[in-house]
A protein has these predicted regions:
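A non-catalytic, helix-rich entry segment at domain boundaries
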Residues: 97-172
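Anion-coordinating catalytic cores for phosphoryl-, nucleotidyl-, and glycosidic chemistry
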Residues: 41, 64-65, 173-177, 188, ...
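A residue-level signal for conserved active-site and pocket-lining positions in enzyme catalytic cores
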Residues: 70, 94-95, 190, 223, ...
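C-terminal, charged and often intrinsically disordered regions of DNA end-processing helicases
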Residues: 1-90
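Metal-dependent nuclease catalytic regions and adjoining charged, substrate-binding loops involved
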Residues: 1-8, 16-19, 23-29, 48, ...
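Hydrophobic (often cysteine-bearing) scaffold residues that line and stabilize catalytic clefts
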Residues: 86, 90, 94, 143, ...
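Mg2+/Mn2+-dependent nuclease catalytic core
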Residues: 171-263, 267
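Short, amphipathic alpha-helical segments that act as regulatory/interfacial helices
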Residues: 91, 95-102, 224
Length: 298
C-alpha cells in the first residue's frame, strides 16, 4: 500500500496544503538579508541611548502582542511574576512529546510520548522542573490529560513527520540590534523543509486551539522576519494550525509581508522603550474585552 493511501483525509490535507513543487517556490534577492538587517538596525538604533547600559531589552512575539493590544495590560503583566500552571505548561510539554514522536522507534502511542516528555522536563534544573516536582496528583493527572489530548489530536490529523522533511520543533531564533541592547527572539513550534540557494522552501507552523485572532498571523510574520535575517532566505509559507478543528490559516511570505513585520517591530519596540525607560504613561485601549481598561472606562 502507498504511504499516502494509509493516511486519513485530514492527514492528506496537511500534505497538500504545505507541499509545493520546486518550480512553484519563490526566490529572493541575495541582498535581502543585508537589506533587512540594515533597515532594522537603523530603525532600532535610535532607541539605544534610552536603554540603560547594563540592561538588555528582550522582545518576543508575546511582548509585541501585549504592547500592541493594550499598553496598560503590558505593564501589569510585566510587574506580575510568571508562575507555571497546567495551562502554561501543557503547550511546551505537548511540543516536546511531538518532537519525540519524530524519532520514536517503538509504536507511537500518545500517552507514552506524554510521559516521556514529562519525565524529561521534570529532570531539568529550571523552574518548570521544580514546579513539576511539587505537582499534586490531581494537577498532574489534569496535565497528562490535556497534553495527551493535544498530542493525540496532532498524531490523528498530521501525517508522520519524515526525517527527510527536516522537522525542527521548538527551535530558538534570535537577532540582536543596537549593539546588543535589543534582542528579538522566539521559538518556532515546527519548521519543515529548507531553502535551496535563494529559493524559499521552509514552512513554519504554529499550533493553536480555539478561535482565530489577527495576532496569530502577526506572530508568524515576526518569525518569518527573524528567519529571513538569520538565513537570508524567508520561509516559503507560514501557517497557524488549529488542532481542535484540523484547519490551517496560512500566508505566503513576500517582501511586502516582511516589511510589514519590520514596521510592527519598530512600532512595538518604540512603545515598550517609551513606557519602560522614558516614563511615558501607558495608554488605555478601546477594547471592550480588556479587563483593565473596560472596567475603568465604565
Amino acid at each position: 500500500m502507498d504511504d499516502n493511501e494509509a493516511l486519513n483525509p485530514s492527514q492528506r490535507n496537511v500534505l497538500e496544503h504545505l507541499g509545493a513543487k520546486l518550480a512553484d517556490r519563490p526566490f529572493f534577492s541575495e541582498q535581502l538579508q543585508s537589506e533587512l538587517k540594515e533597515e532594522l538596525s537603523i530603525r532600532l538604533s535610535k532607541f539605544q541611548d534610552l536603554i540603560p547600559k547594563n540592561e538588555t531589552l528582550f522582545v518576543s512575539k508575546f511582548h509585541l502582542n501585549q504592547i500592541m493590544r493594550c499598553e496598560r495590560q503590558f505593564v501589569a503583566d510585566r510587574e506580575s511574576q510568571f508562575e507555571w500552571s497546567v495551562p502554561t505548561a501543557r503547550g511546551l510539554i505537548s511540543h516536546k512529546a511531538i518532537e519525540l514522536s519524530v524519532f520514536w522507534e517503538r509504536e507511537v502511542e500518545p500517552l507514552s510520548l506524554v510521559d516521556e516528555a514529562l519525565s524529561r522536563c521534570a529532570s531539568g534544573d529550571d523552574a518548570l522542573a521544580s514546579w513539576l516536582y511539587g505537582l499534586q496528583d490531581g494537577d498532574r493527572s489534569q496535565l497528562r490529560s490535556d497534553v495527551n489530548n493535544r498530542v493525540g489530536t496532532f498524531l490523528e490529523s498530521w501525517p508522520p513527520l519524515k526525517k527527510e522533511w527536516r522537522p525542527m520543533l521548538e527551535a530558538p531564533i534570535r537577532a540582536e540590534f543596537a549593539e546588543g541592547a535589543i534582542i528579538l527572539s522566539g521559538k518556532v513550534d515546527l519548521s519543515l523543509g529548507r531553502p535551496l540557494g535563494t529559493t524559499a522552501g521552509k514552512v513554519i507552523v504554529d499550533f493553536k486551539t480555539g478561535n482565530f485572532y489577527s495576532s496569530h498571523r502577526e506572530d508568524l510574520r515576526f518569525y518569518a522576519l527573524l528567519e529571513s535575517i538569520r538565513l537570508g532566505v524567508p520561509p516559503r509559507m507560514v501557517a497557524t494550525y488549529y488542532l481542535d478543528r484540523s484547519e490551517f490559516s496560512s500566508e505566503h511570505i513576500t517582501e511586502n509581508v516582511l516589511e510589514s513585520a519590520l514596521f510592527r517591530v519598530e512600532d512595538g519596540v518604540e512603545k515598550i522603550v517609551n513606557i519602560l525607560f522614558k516614563g511615558t504613561e501607558p495608554k488605555m485601549c478601546s477594547s471592550e474585552w480588556c479587563a483593565l481598561c473596560a472596567h475603568e472606562d465604565s
